[in-house]
Amino acid sequence: MLVEKRVGDVAYEVNPARPCALALDDNLYELLGESDEVSIDNLMDALIERAGKPRPLSLMWHMTRRCNFACPFCFIRDNSFDGDPTFDSVLPLLERIISLGLVRATLSGGECLLVKDFPSIYRYLKESGVLVTIFTNGSLIDGGVLNLFSELPPFSVEITFYDDDFESRPYRAALSLRNLGIDVLGKFTVSREKAALLHSVERWCALHDIPFLFDPVLFNGENGIDAESQAVNGEALVDLNVRRFGVGYGDENVVCTPLRSLQCKAADRAVFLSPELELSICHDMKRRWATAGKGFDEAYRLMRLWIEELKDVPIEGCSGCIDRPLCNMCTARSELIESPHGTRICVPEGHCREVATLGEKMRRRIREQKGDMR
């Protein structure tokens, strides 16, 4: 059964029994340029353009702080957390977000499959025409989860691997999902303890035609775990980042202008829900708005007022440089300083120096690899 999704005067239909099967109406098809292939990103751009105002089209939801793993670099794990959502408790919130045009949702944690009502919540999202991506460690993907995903396939499943036991459930789950026709992305968080496993995990993914990403960036969260102390550094970090960004990194012909606040697409079309059901733009943004008691509409209204106040404000300390891809600075990662003249948005002290130093080491390493000793 197809589910109609409507935003303003445009509509499309979704088949919940497929990972991503959309049928666009004539207005939306024309707006997208009559392309044979339409990305979800382009679809959301078109919906925002047609609506003429921001809409919560994309949801990232950290459903729980609990996890069945004990990684020493986790930014969110807190197994004392007792606020896992129940289907009945979050239904009004989800109904409202969906009614405003929600296109896709990403369910994460902690480990989202620990949530008792995960199947009911997932089924409701899918049967409402939402495209759902799952972030998981894969260890809880059993026969029941596979049956659910076979009936109502997710848009994609991203499994983060933490060891090289290729007979363990996470790896077997990745193969089972792929055999169901579900897109699987293998991921690996590079810490000092686990760095030696990167190559073998990457080879396994390549052998089984599973796309793979790794990330050496660790950051501290709100759970008291000093994740950053586990990060790879020195020459090993240089080598990892050269692999991540490629030998074209730091092209000196690239022009980067100074950053301004909230220029990302997320500011107009994304919402984030914390495990406590607090609303924000993304998980990096520390400013949150409670939905409990006030409901989604009031929290979203207050968030939009804050965004409009700070949108396009210069980020102080950023002059624009060729290390922008490595820098990853944005409003969420900046320091917000209240002053009599309003909120100042500033690059944290020492950030630019740290990024520039790493960027120059990367360019030097790339020149060495190319045999250019300038």
How should these model regions be labeled?
Residues 67, 71-74, 264, 282, ...:
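Short cysteine clusters
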